[in-house]
């Protein structure tokens, strides 16, 4: 009963679900912080998408679930993360981020693309695919 209730509640949030060893898990974007940015983003050998967002930002709340869906779909092919700009001011300052949501795309430690403002999932997927 609890499983079905949880499944219904999660579907309301459109969180991506995956099966692992016959157990349903939620695959979401990684939390990117000032402390782990270098390791997870700059040293990654995979394409990386980082969504810079804040809790109070309306458009960020639209983009957030899309980023989680991309994390589920790309799995181990790309690193998909989110950075809360209120909790981690260093990275946004380093990259001159003044508007949110801003999504930065990295490959081999280099910034290769940028999306400022909300964008459809297909646009973000195209930008990731260009660097796979």
Predicted ranges, named:
Residues 45-47, 64-83:
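Conserved helix-turn-beta segment immediately C-terminal to the redox Cys motif
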Residues 85-93:
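Structural microenvironment flanking redox-active thiols in thiol-disulfide oxidoreductases
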Residues 45-46, 52-56, 99:
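Short pre-active-site segment immediately N-terminal to redox-active cysteine/selenocysteine motifs
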């Amino acid at each position: 009963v609890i499983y079905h209730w949880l499944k219904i509640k999660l579907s309301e949030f459109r969180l991506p679900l995956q099966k692992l060893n016959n157990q349903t898990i939620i695959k979401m974007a990684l939390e990117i912080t000032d402390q782990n940015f270098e390791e997870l983003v700059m040293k990654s050998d995979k394409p990386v998408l980082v969504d810079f967002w804040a809790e109070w930002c309306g458009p960020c709340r639209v983009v957030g679930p899309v980023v989680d869906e991309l994390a589920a779909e790309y799995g181990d092919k790309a690193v998909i993360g989110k950075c809360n700009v209120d909790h981690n001011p260093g990275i946004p300052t380093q990259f001159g981020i003044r508007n949110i949501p801003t999504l930065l795309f990295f490959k081999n430690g280099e910034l290769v693309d940028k999306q400022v403002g909300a964008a459809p999932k297909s646009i973000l997927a195209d930008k990731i695919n260009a660097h796979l």
